[in-house]
Regions:
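Mobile amphipathic helical/loop "lid" adjacent to a hydrophobic cofactor/ligand pocket
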Residues: 85-86, 90-91, 96-209, 213
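N-terminal Rossmann-like FAD-binding beta1-loop-alpha1 element of flavoenzymes
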Residues: 20-50
């Protein structure tokens, strides 16, 4: 690209009679939301250009090389109820690389009792209908008293009666609701926060009841297998970058990496100019009828043209929450399970990433563990040396086999703005996909998907943005997330755009 170059992707492909097969679209942002929107728009016949400022796709779910290992910036999992993310994996040909458990089984180690020795409990399901599928596991869960377990059952039934889309739930914090329903501080720690912190990136006192109800009702109470856990058995970059890029290429999308959008302005014919830079002294102007803005909320605010939202500064009121990941390479095997969750320790979740990182082939004796710390406000800025001093002894408490093992490597990855903060009241701040100006749409896990900031929410936002865009063009739309495979219908019947306040 050179200074002053103008690209006009609106010159459409035509059929034999010379009729245009599509219209031009620019998608800004190459995370899961942007990739999804680009694939859907291209699949509907639009000529799509995808702009991404980084040298890779995948947003905050990516991999990098360290020595002989492929390292994920953070441990990402999904649940069987995450149908949109599974559709995405299918779309990029990667479902087999991120398999699900046959049946939910979460080992939970507690070192917070007087003996200090690790005590194992398990959260797992039986082959029974909801809610009996979890009853046996709850009845024998050793980290709660018998009375606490009984109260969990009653609270779960009450939670199942809530409507996550009820706006009244958005203004209440989850902890207050749990307290009203008889949940002790220990129960919150050993069960509700054990799951909620990992999925919401917030403790119960900082989480909207609406979003918490969405997580627990969908994951635990919608179907027996809804909470079965899946995760990538290869580096995330293989899924979200390599295979995503191949899918985009196959769909005819032009992908421009290391290219940052700098402005979105109206063109004289009612379309859009998107100005972009790919380095010092290089600039490009793309003309399109459709623009999807799939970047974090603060970046979106900076690019929004006048009239897009009634109060665009409300996007700045959507807070963020950090995630910290600690990476430890031992000189021998110290963990025999693929993962576990912890209680009575600052450690939250630990995953064995030896195989997926490639370390197993390079050093058969070593083991690489990834320690995932959500809602990490207290630790996110601690120096590496301090984190090492804090967490290595905790891993030895949880894993006796780690005592005396050599630590070959210890490093940290930090995502200070990993997700939007799911605080009470955030729902009224999250905008719909359609904006107040024709042809401009928003995507990202922070938009109004009804989900917390997850890979599922990101993919759903991309589908919503594409559906709204196709509605604006009056095009038929096959909703890939509709039940029964998705009935072909007009986009305005599937995803009607809404304007007004975000």
């Amino acid at each position: 690209m050179t200074e002053g170059t103008t690209t006009r992707p609106e010159r459409l492909r035509t059929d034999e009679a010379g009729r245009p097969l599509g219209a031009a679209a620019v998608v800004i942002g190459g995370g899961l939301a942007g990739v999804t929107a680009a694939l859907e728009l291209a699949g509907a016949g639009l000529q799509v250009t995808l702009l991404e400022g980084r040298p890779r796709l995948g947003g905050l779910a990516f991999s990098f090389r360290r020595g002989g290992m492929s390292v994920d910036n953070g441990q990402h999992v999904y649940l069987r109820c995450c149908t949109a993310y599974q559709w995405f994996l299918d779309r990029v040909g990667a479902r087999h690389l991120a398999p699900l458990q046959d049946r939910l089984d979460v080992p939970v180690l507690d070192v917070g009792h007087p003996s200090g020795r690790p005590r194992l409990g398990r959260l797992r399901r039986a082959a029974l209908p909801v809610p009996l599928h979890l009853a046996a596991s709850l009845a024998t869960y050793p980290h709660l008293s018998l009375a606490e377990r009984a109260k969990v059952g009653r609270a779960a039934l009450a939670l199942g009666a809530l409507d996550p889309e009820d706006p009244a739930l958005d203004g209440v914090d989850f902890a207050t609701w749990l307290h009203r329903h008889g949940q002790s501080a220990r129960t919150v720690e050993a069960l509700w926060d054990l799951v909620g912190v990992a999925t919401l990136n917030a403790t119960a006192d900082r989480a909207s009841l609406g979003l918490a109800a969405k997580v627990f009702k969908t994951g635990l109470l919608s179907a027996p297998g809804a909470a079965d856990i899946g995760w990538a058995h290869v580096p995330l970059g293989e899924l979200h970058d390599t295979r995503a890029r191949a899918a985009l290429d196959g769909a005819g999308v032009r992908t421009a990496l290391r290219t940052r959008a700098t402005a979105i302005t109206r063109s004289a014919d009612g379309g859009w100019h998107v100005d972009a830079e790919s380095g010092p002294g290089t600039a490009e102007r793309l003309d399109a009828g459709t623009v999807v803005l799939a970047v974090p909320q603060r970046e979106a605010r900076a690019l929004l043209p006048d009239g897009a939202l009634d109060d665009p500064d409300r996007l700045l009121d959507i807070g963020t929450a950090p995630i910290l990941n600690l990476h430890v390479v031992y000189d021998r095997k110290v963990l025999r399970q693929p993962f576990f969750a912890a209680l009575g320790s600052p450690v939250q979740w630990v995953f064995d990433r030896t195989e997926s990182s490639g370390l197993a082939g390079a050093d058969g004796a070593a083991q690489y563990l990834a320690v995932s710390q959500s809602a990490a406000q207290d630790d996110i800025d601690r120096p590496v040396a301090e984190l090492r001093e804090r967490y290595l002894p905790e891993l030895e408490r949880l894993l006796p086999a780690a005592r005396g093992a050599g630590v070959k490597d210890f490093f940290v990855t930090r995502e200070r703005t990993a997700t939007f903060a799911p605080t009470p009241g955030v729902g009224r701040l999250r905008p719909q996909a359609a904006t107040g100006v024709p042809g401009l749409y928003l995507a990202g896990a922070w938009t109004a998907t009804g989900w917390p900031a997850t890979m599922e929410g990101a993919v759903r936002s991309g589908v919503q943005a594409a559906g709204a865009a196709l509605s604006g063009l009056g095009r038929p739309y096959r909703d890939p997330l509709a039940g029964g495979g998705g009935m072909t219908r007009r986009a305005d019947q599937a995803c009607a755009p809404r304007t007004g306040r975000a």
